[in-house]
Amino acid sequence: MPVDFNGRAVDIKNISELANQHNLSLIEDAAHGLGCFYGKKHVGTMCDIGIFSFSTPKIISTGQGGMIVTNNKKLYEKCKALKDFGRKPDAKRNMRMAFEHPTIGYNFKFTEFQAAVGIAQMRKLRKRMITKKKMFRIYKELLSKLSSVNFIKTDLDRVTPW
């Protein structure tokens, strides 16, 4: 599980090659990477599954919860069942299936309120990214005058500092 941390993308190339050699799936932990890029791709979209956190200290918050992204229909169906007590995704429309739980699952559903907050927050993502980058530049300018302070190399076209 590669982890994007503090607004910086993990170097996914070698990890992906190793996973492919051993026929392994990868889950990218992009909890700290929303809005960041690896090359020209958004972090969280480079593996079989990408996960994002919307907990309180993140760039977008719904209080708690998060988001899973995938372009694999089978994994999508599995995630959908896991978040709804193990029910099949179409179980709510079929009363006979509504009480069947073919797999172990959990209650990981967002409330409508959390979803509304998340949508409103997403609309502010670009502005927040710009603000974070401005703050980084200010801190770097002021703190770089101190000989005891060093900065990690940061490409602001790829990184959104937290």
What are these regions (language model features)?
Residues 1-3, 8-14, 21, 37, ...:
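PLP-dependent aminotransferase class I/II
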